C-alpha cells in the first residue's frame, strides 16, 4: 500500500509533517496511511490518536508501526470502524484505552485490522507498481531474497503482482510466502 514513510522520524513533529506532506498528494477526503513509526517517536513512548487529530481532525488516518504489530488511528478512523469505549477486543488483539476508558487509537495485533480492513483494496496494477518500487528498495540494500513472515499469506492482488513480476522478469529477489 502506498503510504507516508515514517522510518527514522524520531519525533511526533516529524511524523505529523511527513503525513501532512504525503496527504497533499492524495485526493481530498481519502485515507492518509503511514508506516514505519517507532514507540520512541512519541513522548513517553505513548502513541495516542490526539497526535494525529491535531493535524487531521476530519480525515481518517492510520499509521502502522515499524514491526507491524500495532497501528495508530485517529478519531475519524476509529469512528468509521465503530470503535468506542464499549468495543470488545477482537481475538488475538486489543484496543488500548486511556484511564478514562476511551480508546487511545493504539490498536495492537489483530485489533489493527478493525481499521486497516476499511482501506480501499488496491488493484493488481497498483500492487505491481508498489512491488516494483519495493524491489528497488530491497536491491538498494543488497537483498537477494525475501520472506513473508505473516501467517496469512498474500492477497489475490499481491499474488497476481508477484506472478506478473516473475513472468516479466522483474522479480529481482527470491521470494517465499506461506
Where are these predicted regions, by residue range?
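Divalent metal-binding segments
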Residues: 1-178
Amino acid at each position: 500500500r502506498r503510504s507516508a514513510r515514517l522510518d527514522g522520524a524520531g519525533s511526533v513533529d516529524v511524523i505529523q509533517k511527513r503525513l501532512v506532506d504525503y496527504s497533499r498528494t492524495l485526493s481530498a477526503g481519502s485515507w492518509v496511511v503511514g508506516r514505519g513509526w517507532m514507540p520512541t517517536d512519541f513522548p513517553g513512548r505513548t502513541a495516542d490518536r490526539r497526535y494525529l487529530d491535531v493535524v487531521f481532525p476530519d480525515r481518517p488516518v492510520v499509521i502502522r508501526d515499524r514491526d507491524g504489530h500495532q497501528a495508530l488511528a485517529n478519531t475519524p478512523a476509529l469512528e468509521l470502524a465503530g470503535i468506542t469505549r464499549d468495543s470488545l477486543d477482537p481475538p488475538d488483539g486489543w484496543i488500548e484505552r486511556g484511564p478514562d476508558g476511551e480508546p487511545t487509537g493504539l490498536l495492537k495485533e489483530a485489533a489493527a485490522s478493525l481499521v486497516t480492513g476499511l482501506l480501499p483494496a488496491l488493484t493488481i496494477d497498483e500492487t505491481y507498481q508498489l512491488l516494483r518500487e519495493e524491489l528497488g528498495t530491497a536491491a538498494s540494500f543488497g537483498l537477494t531474497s525475501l520472506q513473508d513472515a505473516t501467517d496469512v499469506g498474500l492477497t489475490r492482488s499481491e499474488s497476481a503482482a508477484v506472478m506478473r513480476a516473475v513472468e516479466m522478469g522483474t522479480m529481482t529477489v527470491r521470494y517465499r510466502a506461506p
